[in-house]
């Protein structure tokens, strides 16, 4: 799990205004942090297939949110991709 301080940091970095916790950018950034954390977990726990299922769900959810953002706000999408270092 992501630590509370780390979560607050991510929210403050990607929030569009003060108190924004549900914008698409914030959701994608939080999911991305969880995905990176799970990838580190799999380096030492190669046979954890149950968690791998959860990882695939998170990747799918992130992809859907990215597609939505690309469809609605292309400029914000490009900025987010660059900030998070995702390939697209």
Curated annotation (Swiss-Prot):
Keyword terms, alphabetized: Ribonucleoprotein, Ribosomal protein, RNA-binding, rRNA-binding
SMART domains xref list: Ribosomal_S15
InterPro entries: Ribosomal_uS15 (IPR000589), Ribosomal_uS15_bac-type (IPR005290), uS15_NS1_RNA-bd_sf (IPR009068)
The organism's place on the tree of life at top rank: Bacteria
Family: Belongs to the universal ribosomal protein uS15 family.
Subunit architecture: Part of the 30S ribosomal subunit. Forms a bridge to the 50S subunit in the 70S ribosome, contacting the 23S rRNA.
Physiological role: One of the primary rRNA binding proteins, it binds directly to 16S rRNA where it helps nucleate assembly of the platform of the 30S subunit by binding and bridging several RNA helices of the 16S rRNA.
Protein name: Small ribosomal subunit protein uS15
Organism name: Leptospira borgpetersenii serovar Hardjo-bovis (strain JB197)
């Amino acid at each position: 799990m992501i630590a509370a301080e780390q979560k607050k940091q991510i929210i403050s970095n990607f929030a569009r205004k003060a108190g924004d916790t549900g914008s698409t950018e914030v959701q994608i950034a939080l999911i991305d942090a969880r995905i990176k954390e799970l990838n580190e977990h799999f380096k030492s726990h190669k046979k954890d297939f149950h968690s791998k299922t959860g990882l695939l769900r998170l990747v799918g959810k992130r992809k859907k949110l990215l597609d939505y953002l690309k469809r609605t706000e292309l400029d914000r999408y490009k900025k987010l991709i660059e900030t998070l270092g995702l390939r697209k």
